[in-house]
Every structure is written in structure tokens, then in C-alpha cells.
Amino acid sequence: MAFGPAAMGYDRAITIFSPDGSLYQVDYAFEAVKKGWTAIGIKSKSSVVIASEKRKAQSLLDVDSIEKVFLIDDHVGCSFAGLASDGRVLIDYARNIALQHRLIYDEPVSIDYLTKSVADVKQMYTQHGGVRPFGVALVIAGIDKSVPKLFMTEPSGQYMPYQAVAIGQGYYTATEFLEKNYKEDLNVEETILLALKALSATLKPNEKLTPNTVEIGYASTQTGLFLKMTNEDKNMYLQKL
């Protein structure tokens, strides 16, 4: 995205709209999301699944230190695409919201309220001088009173519920795959396989998913708990692709 001298003032100031109604710094934040590792969220009638690829930014990096699916509370988890530091800050904020809600009300926070709270923070950073937008999109999923919930929050502060959603580098290819193959009546195993197939569709021809290059989190209405999958379980599902 390039702009001439006439657009420079709108380009640099986050609080000023351009003549065509754009906030360029927010647009740039969306570009940061598109450069992130692909993450996918899928909701069925009985489960939710988040799958995200993870790669080494440096060859000597310990792959076990890379985390792309995060627990927010017992019943909800998330992943992100974009700037990792921005994602970490928002995930910590979401965890604090969930913890405070349990301490005050002695019950799990609703996923709708949790998502709105995170989105409100992101929106605030689009309208004040001296700050920049969060360059990250979050996929938030879990079980809320026996009902599967799936949301995606954008850098602008917009958030929407989804049946299935993809963010990051491979979002376009993954979204096309999900539009063709998504079914609402999938069980948890079928939902996990669909997420892995959608993620595989975004890879180059000579690449394939391994237990070390993908993270999976899931929850079912049967237990209501959001769990992260072990390497042994990931390998079992990857062999079925």
C-alpha cells in the first residue's frame, strides 16, 4: 500500500480520517495480520477447534518455546495472527478479565463479554493520539453454558461470531477450503480433521504438517473444557489426513 505526498498527513496521524474515509494506520495493522502464521477456528453444533501453524523465526530457536494456541480460562482459548508481542499483551488482558470475573461472580466469564472486552481495548487504540493500533487479530473459541462460541477480533476493534474463520498468511486459501467443506453437524474428531485439512491447504507443495509445526486446541459440549492437544494425539490425527 503506497501513498503520495497528499496522503502523508493522513498516513501518519491515527486520529485523522483520509478523504476516502480510511484510517491508514488501522489499514497497516491489517497488513501486519496478513503476515502472521495462519490460524483457523471452526465451530460445530457440539464443539469448537482452533488450529494454528507454528514456525521457527530462527533456525536455532527452541520450537517447544513457541506457543500459538493459548488457554484463557478452563472453557475458552484463543490464537492470533500478527505481531506476537501485541498478541501476548491482549491474551494477558483477556486472562485478567476471566480471572476477575471468577473472583467477583464465582462463575466463568461469558465468551461474548470476554471478546467484547478485548475488542473494546483494540478500538480505543484506534482513536487516541500517541498510540498505534494493535497489529493482531484474535480467534477466540470455547463452550459457554453448553453452547459452542467462536469469534474473531480485528485490529479495528470490530468483532464478529463465525461458524469458521481463518486469519494470517493463508487466510484466503483456508477460507475457500472451509466454505467448500464446512458442515455444522461435525463431531469433535471431524472438526479437528477439517481444521487440519484447511491448514494443510495453505502449505507449499513440498511442506506438510507435523506435531511440531501445528498447535491444536479444542472443546466439546460434553466436557465444556478447552484443552490443548498433545504431540501424540496430534500425530494420530495427522496420520488420518
Swiss-Prot record:
Q: How is its activity regulated?
A: The formation of the proteasomal ATPase PAN-20S proteasome complex, via the docking of the C-termini of PAN into the intersubunit pockets in the alpha-rings, triggers opening of the gate for substrate entry. Interconversion between the open-gate and close-gate conformations leads to a dynamic regulation of the 20S proteasome proteolysis activity.
Q: Which GO terms describe its biological process?
A: proteasome-mediated ubiquitin-dependent protein catabolic process
Query: May I have one GO cellular component term?
Result: cytoplasm
Keyword flag Cytoplasm: yes
Q: Give the UniProt keywords, A-Z.
A: Cytoplasm, Proteasome
How far does the signal peptide extend, from start to end residue?
none
Q: Which residues form a coiled coil?
A: none
Where does it live in the cell? Answer: Cytoplasm
What GO molecular function terms would the record report?
threonine-type endopeptidase activity
Show the SMART domains listed in the entry: Proteasome_A_N
> What family classification does the UniProt entry report for this protein?
Belongs to the peptidase T1A family.
On assembly, the entry states:
The 20S proteasome core is composed of 14 alpha and 14 beta subunits that assemble into four stacked heptameric rings, resulting in a barrel-shaped structure. The two inner rings, each composed of seven catalytic beta subunits, are sandwiched by two outer rings, each composed of seven alpha subunits. The catalytic chamber with the active sites is on the inside of the barrel. Has a gated structure, the ends of the cylinder being occluded by the N-termini of the alpha-subunits. Is capped at one or both ends by the proteasome regulatory ATPase, PAN.
Q: What is the role of the protein in this entry? A: Component of the proteasome core, a large protease complex with broad specificity involved in protein degradation.
Its name, as the record gives it, is: Proteasome subunit alpha
